[in-house]
Amino acid sequence: ISFLLIDMATKGVSTKPITLISGKSPFCETFFDNVEVPKGNLIGELNAGWTIAKKLLQHERAFISNFGLAAGMGSKRDIVSIAKKHLGEENGKINNGFYRSEISSHKIKEHAFGLTLKRAGDEGGKASATASMFKLYGTEHNKKRHELMVAASGINGVAWDGDEFDDNDKNLTRAWLRTKGNSIEGGTSE
């Protein structure tokens, strides 16, 4: 396996968007029909492409794991606000003991994961095999976060179309469906 850079405008290169269950198309199939690539586009040595690809995957996984955490901490979709909106609140607390407990547990894990990522960065910050573990945990954490928001939203958590649902509910449904792609990108969770 060798690693080549290929200009997407090269004759014979074409793409076809892959529509996900969220309705979005962030991924594409790429087709190479009789494409010729100059030798100068070889990255590294001939037959050493897998080593380069593994390093790229480590960086991608590191990005995804941090992105999953950042999505939870700085998101417009605050899990507590959504739960209060749909379940109600009493004395400033979510008005449902089960969800209050689940969300509290989730937020504690989110905080611990954030501290772990920070510590790993402080200790060197290099992409390594640790990035695979962080990517796996970050992916599962992000999926769980969205599952909690959807569940707490009740029927509004599966909003798609219609005037009876607001745009925030519709966007939450699509974001929840989008999290399924997190377990594939950057190397599958399997």
Task: Label every model-predicted segment.
Residues 1-14, 149, 159, 177, ...:
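Glycine-rich flavin
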Residues 50-69, 153-190:
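Glycine-rich phosphate/cofactor-binding loops in nucleotide/flavin-utilizing enzymes
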Residues 84, 88-94, 111-164:
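C-terminal helix-coil-helix/basic helical segment that borders enzyme active sites and/or dimer interfaces
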Residues 103, 138, 187:
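Hydrophobic, well-ordered secondary-structure elements that form the walls
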